[in-house]
């Protein structure tokens, strides 16, 4: 990790301390030394507003400029909300999704959809969706099989996305 990346992470951390309702979802660096791209993804429990992203971007940009972090080199700073299509990465994101259907990919390769029932510091409890099974020569049918809630530790989850439904 470069000196600039460490400095930016420190700036983000300091700015978040002043804005306790916001939390960091992810920070990514890309580009070349002469043209860096910094992507900061923020959220809050009630959902972050575009104005809050803009205000945070201005504050972070001011710190970068005041400290002449990139000298004469160009950089692009983007501060964004996670968006509905991005994976859930931190436990606070899961709390907002209680009652929603999520798509899980576990570290062991298991994939399934489930309704998020609860969230703790260690992980989540989900209710898997009914399974589709074939009955003889008939088409697939959803069969009511006794499905039990399933506990997952965050360490077991490789990827988790919200399933967006427009019903």
Swiss-Prot record:
Swiss-Prot/TrEMBL keywords: Cytoplasm, Ribosome biogenesis
Keyword flag Cytoplasm: yes
GO CC annotation terms, alphabetical: cytosol
Entries under Pfam families matching the protein: RimP_N
Predominant location: cytoplasm
Signal peptide: none
Location relative to the cell: Cytoplasm
GO BP annotation list: ribosomal small subunit assembly; translation
PANTHER family recorded: RIBOSOME MATURATION FACTOR RIMP
Family statement: Belongs to the RimP family.
HAMAP family: RimP (MF_01077)
Known function: Required for maturation of 30S ribosomal subunits.
Name of the protein this chain belongs to: Ribosome maturation factor RimP
Organism: Cytophaga hutchinsonii (strain ATCC 33406 / DSM 1761 / CIP 103989 / NBRC 15051 / NCIMB 9469 / D465)
